[in-house]
Regions:
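N-terminal nucleotide-binding beta1-loop-alpha1 segment
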Residues: 1-27, 202
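Conserved N-terminal catalytic core of the sugar/cofactor nucleotidyltransferase
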Residues: 1-13, 35, 39-111, 120-122, ...
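Active-site metal-binding loops of divalent metal-dependent hydrolases
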Residues: 18, 113-114
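Hydrophobic packing residues within well-ordered alpha-helices of enzyme cores
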Residues: 22, 68-72, 224
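A structural signal for short hydrophobic beta-strand segments in well-ordered beta-sheet cores
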Residues: 33, 148-150, 205
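Residue-level signal for inorganic ion chemistry
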Residues: 42, 68, 99, 113, ...
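Catalytic-core segments of class I nucleotidyltransferases/pyrophosphorylases
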Residues: 108, 115, 124, 128, ...
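A short, conserved acidic/glycine-rich loop-to-beta-strand motif
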Residues: 130-140
Length: 240
C-alpha cells in the first residue's frame, strides 16, 4: 500500500460522547479533551494519524462541542484539512451519516476515546487483499489476572501471568469503502452497522498486536497517562 493510499483516506473521529464515567473531568470538558500527559486525548490521536499520513479529518462532536471547536481552531494543524461537524446528541451512526455528506472515497472511522499505534499501511494492505468492503481493527483480549492450570487431581501444573485470551475486541480504526456506508441506518448504532456488514459477509478483521488503550474510566486515564509516551514514537516523520 502506497503513502497515497493513506493520504487519500478521510479519517472520521467520533468525539461526541459525554464520558460520564470520567467525571469530574467531563463535567467541564468533552471526553476527547480529557488530558493525557499534558495534552488532550484528541491531540494524541490527531498527531498519530497525521504522522501516519492521513491528511483529511472530520471530527464529529456533540457534548460540549464548543470546547472541541475551540481546541481545533487553536490547534497547530496547518497542513491538515480538519472539519468539525456538530450533530448534537445522536448515535455514532448518525454522526457518520452526517459526515459522509462531506467526503468522497474511503473513510477510516476512529473512536475518539481510543489510542492505538495501528499500522495503517498494513491495515490498508489487508483490506485490499481480502476484497472487503470494510475492515475492522481488532485487539486480543488479555486476562487481568494470572491463570492457574491444574490437572484432574488438582495438582497445579503451571501458571500464566495475565495471558492473552482467545477473544478479540473492536477498537475501531474501521476502514470502509464507500459501498460499506450503505449499511448505515439513521437511528441505529455501531453494533447494528457492524452486524449488518458481518451478516452480508463484507466485514473482515485486522489483528492489531501493538499498543492500545480505550479511555472510559479514571482508572483507564491514569494508566494511559503513564503509557501514552510509549504509544507513539516519532522518527523520521513516520509513526512507529
Amino acid at each position: 500500500v502506497t503513502k497515497n493510499y493513506i493520504s487519500d483516506l478521510t479519517a472520521i473521529l467520533l468525539c461526541g460522547g459525554k464520558g460520564e464515567r470520567l467525571r469530574p473531568f467531563t463535567e467541564s470538558l468533552p471526553k476527547a479533551l480529557v488530558p493525557l500527559n499534558g495534552e488532550p486525548l484528541l491531540a494524541h490521536l490527531l498527531r498519530y494519524l497525521s504522522t501516519a499520513g492521513v491528511e483529511r479529518f472530520i471530527v464529529c462532536v456533540g457534548y460540549k462541542a464548543e470546547e472541541i471547536k475551540k481546541f481545533l481552531r487553536e490547534g497547530a494543524y496547518p497542513e491538515r484539512e480538519v472539519t468539525c461537524i456538530d450533530s448534537g446528541d445522536v448515535s455514532m451512526t448518525d454522526r457518520i451519516l452526517d459526515s459522509i455528506e462531506h467526503v468522497e472515497g474511503r473513510v477510516l472511522v476512529c473512536y475518539g476515546d481510543t489510542l492505538a499505534n495501528v499500522d495503517l499501511a498494513s491495515l490498508g494492505q489487508a483490506h485490499r487483499e481480502s476484497g472487503a468492503l470494510a475492515t475492522l481493527t481488532t485487539y486480543s483480549l488479555h486476562s487481568p489476572f494470572g491463570i492457574v492450570h491444574f490437572d484432574d487431581s488438582k495438582r497445579i501444573t503451571s501458571f500464566d501471568e495475565k495471558p492473552r485470551l482467545p477473544y478479540w475486541i473492536n477498537i475501531g480504526f474501521l476502514l470502509c469503502e464507500p459501498e460499506a456506508l450503505k449499511f448505515l441506518k439513521r437511528g441505529s448504532d455501531m453494533p447494528e452497522f457492524l452486524s449488518a456488514m458481518a451478516s452480508a459477509g463484507v466485514l473482515y478483521a485486522f489483528e492489531h498486536a501493538g499498543k492500545h488503550i480505550t479511555v472510559n474510566t479514571e482508572k483507564d486515564r491514569a494508566r494511559a497517562e503513564t503509557e501514552v509516551i510509549e504509544f507513539f514514537t516519532y522518527m523520521n516523520g513516520e509513526a512507529k
